[in-house]
């Protein structure tokens, strides 16, 4: 992805996940916004892009952070919201036996005490494979991958969800279900 497209993708993540009001947007409860409204509000803040570029970024992103509606008129972040405007209703799913969480080693002491909590997001994000978890953890420093006993959690009454981009979500992960 070109630097311009990467910059726009980061801008879209910021707006669609965290601060839509920063450019005067409101998201609906499911996180959707009309693409033409997004383009106009972004232009007023100096971010210039068009419908074709948005579709290109969404379609060519390996992380699949965004979803475009079936009619092609709206966009939303697939998951990762901290804004309270959004409450996507994911359908609960039975997880695989293990899921993975990538983090930085400097957070491990806190995790041992508190488990994994969503903090300023709505869910804890989990990966289906270790490689993805390593990439996620590397963004925050020296990575460590935690193996989550997801199926055991599910059998004990915890819920798991899966976003459209394949990221697994849970409200929290108590430490007794985490393997270092």
UniProtKB/Swiss-Prot annotation:
The scientific name of the source species is Pectobacterium atrosepticum (strain SCRI 1043 / ATCC BAA-672)
| One Pfam family recorded for the sequence | PTS_2-RNA
Q: Which HAMAP family match?
A: KptA
Per the entry, what this protein does is: Removes the 2'-phosphate from RNA via an intermediate in which the phosphate is ADP-ribosylated by NAD followed by a presumed transesterification to release the RNA and generate ADP-ribose 1''-2''-cyclic phosphate (APPR>P). May function as an ADP-ribosylase.
Recorded GO terms, molecular function?
NAD+ poly-ADP-ribosyltransferase activity; tRNA 2'-phosphotransferase activity
Q: Which UniProt keywords apply?
A: NAD, Transferase
Asked whether the UniProt record includes Transferase among its keywords, one would answer: yes
Q: Name one GO biological process term.
A: tRNA splicing, via endonucleolytic cleavage and ligation
**What name does the UniProt record give this protein?**
Probable RNA 2'-phosphotransferase
Family statement drawn from the similarity comment of this UniProt entry: Belongs to the KptA/TPT1 family.
Q: What is its EC number?
A: 2.7.1.-
